Amino acid sequence: MSRVSQARNLGKYFLLIDNMLVVLGFFVVFPLISIRFVDQMGWAAVMVGIALGLRQFIQQGLGIFGGAIADRFGAKPMIVTGMLMRAAGFATMGIAHEPWLLWFSCLLSGLGGTLFDPPRSALVVKLIRPQQRGRFFSLLMMQDSASAVIGALLGSWLLQYDFRLVCATGPVLFVLCAAFNAWLLPAWKLSTVRTPVREGMTRVMRDKRFVTYVLTLAGYYMLAVQVMLMLPIMVNDVAGAPSAVKWMYAIEACLSLTLLYPIARWSEKHFRLEHRLMAGLLIMSLSMMPVGMVSGLQQLFTLICLFYIGSIIAEPARETLSASLADARARGSYMGFSRLGLAIGGAIGYIGGGWLFDLGKSAHQPELPWMMLGIIGIFTFLALGWQFSQKRAARRLLERDA
């Protein structure tokens, strides 16, 4: 086996262990924020939505800068620094008794993510061969789901005793992850050339097709982020106990572990990436619309199952499509910019979702936020369909001219 092949094989295992620690550390804390501050402390959902949206926007919106810096200086220093900053943010959350302190903790957490997330994504693109990426992203999603439910179960158990225990466990896991990267991650370059920061960012901004695709995905993310805000609140309201939230993540884990890889393997043989992304988004959108009308936990979990199935279909295709569109000369910059859709969609989804949830509750129209999210998903579906049809038309024109 050549040294390159050996490095790729070892890199896969490194990426899987690193991903497990990151997801565990995140899901021990974040799914319980809305339960802690909305249900236990009585804050308005929009206040918590601002905090979650701030974290999302900072982490993903500034991702292009983190990616461009990583293109210049390498992945290792960015990842280690970002992990430690995320740990500090989670620790601060444990003493948040005023909204501004929660916002500050989410700001720290987001800045940490800005540093470590783009280079980690770029390492996947660097180490995994193009024909294997779809399956590897599926494996990562399966691991995400299993780690998420373990993290949520651990966090829910700790919440029974003290929220500060929740906010101590998350930082410990991120410090462990920082040490793991500092010890084992080689000083790899992310791009084929050492790209100056400004050049990497400029290269991305000139790629109009990639920019349009990323910005359109904001609508997709408005729906996706509700697993952190409105869906846990809804499950808690219907069940009458925060412990029911862990079953929501258990459903996701079961579906991902049993369906994700088989669906990905089958669909990649029969459907284009664009079609898989759009089909998943359509299922997610349609499953959102009736959520506000249900009153039983069984009905709610059925809709959540449909939502997760849509995500299982869409997410590996979205990741693979984003990676395939990235320029190898500026991988970090591309993968950083690819998070901008999540920054915009996540911020609007959290803040707007929280505001609509409060508005629907006060107006006795609980279906309002869910119908709006479903409509946004349908419009995003149509916009993506138009973009992909334009791309196919341009390809046919080039083939005819040739």
From Swiss-Prot:
SUPFAM superfamilies cross-referenced by the UniProt entry: MFS general substrate transporter
Question: What GO MF terms are annotated?
Answer: transmembrane transporter activity
Keywords, alphabetical: Cell inner membrane, Cell membrane, Membrane, Transmembrane, Transmembrane helix, Transport
| Cytoplasmic side of membrane | 1-12, 117-138, 186-213, 265-276, 321-339, 389-402
Mind telling me which residue stretches traverse the membrane in this protein?
Answer: 13-33, 99-116, 139-159, 165-185, 214-234, 244-264, 277-297, 300-320, 340-360, 368-388
Q: How does it sit in the membrane?
A: Multi-pass membrane protein
Which PANTHER family does the entry link to?
MULTIDRUG RESISTANCE PROTEIN MDTH, RESISTANCE PROTEIN MDTM, PUTATIVE-RELATED-RELATED
Q: What is this protein called?
A: Multidrug resistance protein MdtH
Q: Which organism is it from?
A: Shigella flexneri serotype 5b (strain 8401)
